[in-house]
UniProtKB/Swiss-Prot annotation:
Name the record gives this protein: General transcription factor IIH subunit 3
Subcellular location as annotated: Nucleus
One Pfam family this sequence matches: Tfb4
Keywords: DNA damage, DNA repair, Metal-binding, Nucleus, Transcription, Transcription regulation, Zinc, Zinc-finger
Family in the record: Belongs to the TFB4 family.
Protein's gene: Gtf2h3
Cross-referenced InterPro entries: TFIIH_Tfb4/GTF2H3, vWFA_dom_sf
Length: 309
């Protein structure tokens, strides 16, 4: 029991709040809306905090022009509601309850609801960049995990994982930043899980495969909560004892640097490893001039002259 108390489990949930994708869902009169998605996320967050008093939580909204922490909020501090009553907000009573609700979870739900409402009402779409800033959200999650690991006591161990709830399509423009974040997470032994609502994500498939996480495309979006609790609530140690969805085939195609499109066969710069779909004598990334190798020229053999007698 002491070993469990000395181990901290930090779960960072990244929610895709792309207003264009969720707006299309509303136009389709779909039963699954952003508010229902956030309800499922908050149930997962509450269940994670209930699993152990030392469990920690963070929720990030991945928007089209920014990445914002929904929990802890703007006034939150590292350690708020994380099993440390000394760091709780003044208005929160850790041992009390209100209307049958646990105060810490009630405060967390209120903070998340307030932040997501503020984000969606104040969002202003400018320009043609309407892709979700997923790579930036993952980088922010890694920074938060690194900061949380510095606050861990010497006799404690912290295990961290990131859950991405993806809605909109992938952005090939973020390919390089995305791959850098994936390898940084792998180096820090941080799992990246992915729960995809709509079309498959090749980038998240690679992220889950490289870091050892789980990738799941939800068959029915209204059943999101059941899949979150079944697949993504258990941590890495508990998953080995459960029957989980089988692994999927990973799309390892790379995005070219010239058009940002996924390709199967391309040209790679031998200096900076940039990938291009068409041959270019000069690398546009590092400006290296390539030597074009021509087929070897075969010299004609000299005919031996016969000596006349």
């Amino acid at each position: 029991m002491a070993a469990d108390e000395d181990e901290l489990n930090l779960l960072v949930i990244i929610v895709d709040t792309n207003p264009i994708w969720w707006g299309k869902q509303a136009l389709k009169e779909s039963q699954f809306t952003l508010s229902k998605c956030m309800d499922a996320v908050m149930v997962l967050a509450n269940a994670h905090l209930f699993m152990n008093r030392s469990n920690q939580l963070a929720v990030i909204a991945s928007h089209i022009q920014e990445s914002r922490f929904l929990y802890p909020g703007k006034n939150g501090r590292l350690g708020d509601f994380f099993g440390d009553p000394g760091n709780a907000l003044p208005d929160c009573n850790p041992s009390g309850s209100k209307d049958g609700k646990y105060e810490l979870l009630t405060a967390a739900n209120e903070v998340i609801a307030e932040e997501i409402k503020d984000l969606m009402t104040k969002s202003d779409i400018k320009g043609q960049h309407t892709e979700t800033l997923l790579a930036g959200s993952l980088a922010k999650a890694l920074c938060y995990i690194h900061r949380a690991s510095k606050a861990v006591k010497d006799n404690q161990e912290m295990k961290s994982r990131i859950l991405v709830i993806k809605a909109a399509e992938d952005s090939a423009l973020q390919y390089m930043n995305f791959m850098n974040v994936i390898f940084a997470a792998q180096k820090q032994n941080i799992l990246i899980d992915a729960c995809v609502l709509d079309s498959d994500s090749g980038l998240l498939q690679q992220a889950c495969d490289i870091t050892g996480g789980l990738y799941l495309k939800v068959p029915q979006m209204p059943s999101l909560l059941q899949y979150l609790l079944w697949v993504f609530l258990p941590d890495q140690d508990q998953r080995s004892q459960l029957i989980l969805p089988p692994p999927i085939h990973v799309d390892y195609r790379a995005a070219c640097f010239c058009h940002r499109s996924l390709i199967e066969i391309g040209y790679v710069c031998s200096v900076c490893l940039s990938i291009f779909c068409n041959f270019s004598p000069i690398c546009t990334t590092c400006e290296t001039a390539f030597k074009i190798s021509l087929p070897p020229v075969l010299k004609a053999k000299k005919k031996k002259q016969k000596v006349s007698l």
